């Protein structure tokens, strides 16, 4: 349950990026610096209908982390500001669910309407349930941020209506978290769960199965059905929005570091290059922008996770000069690739 599609194909509401920029501004980093190297415009942050690509979200997070390498808990700061009302009809659907089981089912069905990057899996036995949050599919350098953000976001958005249920089963619930205890403790004080182990390699919550099917206090079947119908409409609209951009992204990310040319992609899509260029422009992007997005994502992986040198990464990504790659990398992340690599 809850396994995510490839990041290149995922799109989320703009709300989380707006909060990210708010946190950045408070810490002295301008919005323009956070969004540089992405297809997100500052004006998009105030558009309630805007959606952003997950890869652009990851790029924005990387830029902020690169600017603030010594700031701990940025993910928790962002996630703790989330509110279900900011997610529109999906948020109201969640608040109207009859049980935690129904809530998780709805969340997975409309996962694209959330801002979550972590993968959620449910395991059940006759008496117990275990929910695991996993970020292993994300690039290593941003996993910690998204684990922090999404755990904090879950706590912040569900406490108001799930608190009575959590209090009833407090002595039967336990959690194992990879998050730093001191950073998360202020949020956990809002939740009546006392058995929490920090510093683990995974993020799991154990609770009795009876709790999963216990009625929630704000359940409203009529509101839920109305919101579900509208969520279906939103999902269909977002699917149509993916269009040709998602297809081109999938071609670029097919073989990490070996990027096809524009002509190659047009040929694979059985489309004249002029037609492909026009279709991408209609969706507000270009092959050059998408190639830059792919290169920026792969560059970080090759530097940090594969351990290649700056020269090797430059060659692998198709640059003829290391200086050209270094200039592009600094434009994407605000620091030189050599400095980024040293930070590990």
UniProtKB/Swiss-Prot annotation:
GO terms for molecular function: DNA-binding transcription factor activity; transcription cis-regulatory region binding. Pfam families: Arabinose_bd (PF12625), HTH_18 (PF12833). Keywords: DNA-binding, Transcription, Transcription regulation. InterPro entries: AraC-type_N (IPR032687), Homeodomain-like_sf (IPR009057), HTH_AraC (IPR018060), Tscrpt_reg_AraC-type_HTH (IPR020449). Residues 263-284, 310-333 bind DNA. Residues 242-343 form the HTH araC/xylS-type domain. GO terms for cellular component: cytosol. This is Uncharacterized HTH-type transcriptional regulator Mb1430. It comes from Mycobacterium bovis (strain ATCC BAA-935 / AF2122/97). The lineage of its organism: Bacteria, Bacillati, Actinomycetota, Actinomycetes, Mycobacteriales.
């Amino acid at each position: 349950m809850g396994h995510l599609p490839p990041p290149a194909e995922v799109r989320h509401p703009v709300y989380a990026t707006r909060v990210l920029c708010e946190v950045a501004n408070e810490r002295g980093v301008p919005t323009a610096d956070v969004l540089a190297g992405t297809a997100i415009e500052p004006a998009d942050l105030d558009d309630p209908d805007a959606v952003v690509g997950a890869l652009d979200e990851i790029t924005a997070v990387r830029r902020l982390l690169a600017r603030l390498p010594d700031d701990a808990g940025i993910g928790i700061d962002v996630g703790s500001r989330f509110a279900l009302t900011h997610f529109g009809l999906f948020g109201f659907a969640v608040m109207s669910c009859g049980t935690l089981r129904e809530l998780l089912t709805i969340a997975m069905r409309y996962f694209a309407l959330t801002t979550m990057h972590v993968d959620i899996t449910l395991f059940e036995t006759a008496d117990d349930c275990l929910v695991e949050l996993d970020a292993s599919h994300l690039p290593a350098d941003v996993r910690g941020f998204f684990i922090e953000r999404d755990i904090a976001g879950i706590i912040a958005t569900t406490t108001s209506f799930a608190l009575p249920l959590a209090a009833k089963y407090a002595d039967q619930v336990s959690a194992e978290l990879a998050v730093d205890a001191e950073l998360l403790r202020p949020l956990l004080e809002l939740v009546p769960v006392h058995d929490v182990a920090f510093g683990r390699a995974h993020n799991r919550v154990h609770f009795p199965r009876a709790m999963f099917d216990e009625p929630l206090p704000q359940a409203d079947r009529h509101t839920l059905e109305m919101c579900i119908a509208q969520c279906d409409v939103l999902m269909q609209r977002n699917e149509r929005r993916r269009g040709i951009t998602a297809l081109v992204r999938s071609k670029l990310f097919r073989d990490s570091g070996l990027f096809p040319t524009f002509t190659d992609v047009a040929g694979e899509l059985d489309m004249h290059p002029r037609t492909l260029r026009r279709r991408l422009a209609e969706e507000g992007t270009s092959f050059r922008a998408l190639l830059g997005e792919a290169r920026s994502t792969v560059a970080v992986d090759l530097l940090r996770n594969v351990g290649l040198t700056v020269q090797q990464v430059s060659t692998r990504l198709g640059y003829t000069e290391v200086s050209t790659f270094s200039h592009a990398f600094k434009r994407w992340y605000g620091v030189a690739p050599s400095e980024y690599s040293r930070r590990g």
